Amino acid sequence: MPGEELMGNRRKVIVVEGTPRTSKKQFARLLARELNYHFVGEPVPDSGILKSFYRGGDRYTLATELYFLVSRFKQLGQAMEQDLFSPSDTVLSFMIEKSRIYASMTLSDEEQKIYDSIYPMLSTTGVKPDLIVYLYAEPSIILRAVRNSPITGEEFMTREYLDSLIEAYHSFFYRYTACPVVFFDVSEIPGWNGENQDVAKDMIRFIDRLKPGSNFYVPRLAAP
């Protein structure tokens, strides 16, 4: 496959993560197709859960965060189980650690203690990324996407919440040392929807030249 030929330093597990409305799933699926990798998408949440979460109902916060944690744990567990019988290189559109990012922003101190007592049992999935591609965008662009095409529950997302979430994501990935992290500001791509094949091919070339730690990707695309 063309993508495989480009990526000489083969990485078995690639994770595409990021802030809301950055087309993580679409770009992860495209990278998987270009590399001839297996694709594992994040589980689709229940719309009622999302609505309760973004409305800010405190009584649902802990239950919501545990729901997401368990859902992601199950999805990764199923992916690992399949890989035991037919090992394959994989691109995932999420990582279990994102659960803790969200929880740290929304839970009270007492709820955080309960969450922290459960998290270690559900965060050891055996999935160890060889590379993380972190997608992010300007808050105004994310909120515009929410207004133009709202997903149930997201209409209750505030600018203050989004600013804090992006800051938490940035902080987490700047400090991440288990594998290289590629920072990609998708605001740089007009009309970004995660399905730009030229960007995917250019990203694969960039991945081939990564250094340890944080790497900052700026697409180098041919003029139309």
Model regions and ranges:
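P-loop (Walker A) phosphate-binding loop of NTP-binding proteins
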Residues: 19
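Glycine-rich phosphate-binding loop used to anchor ATP phosphates in small-molecule kinases
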Residues: 60, 64-127
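Hydrophobic positions on the alpha1 helix immediately C-terminal to the Walker A/P-loop
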Residues: 27, 31
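A glycine- and Lys/Arg-enriched "phosphate-lid" helix/loop adjacent to the NTP-binding pocket
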Residues: 99-167
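NTP-dependent small-molecule kinase module
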Residues: 147-156, 160-224
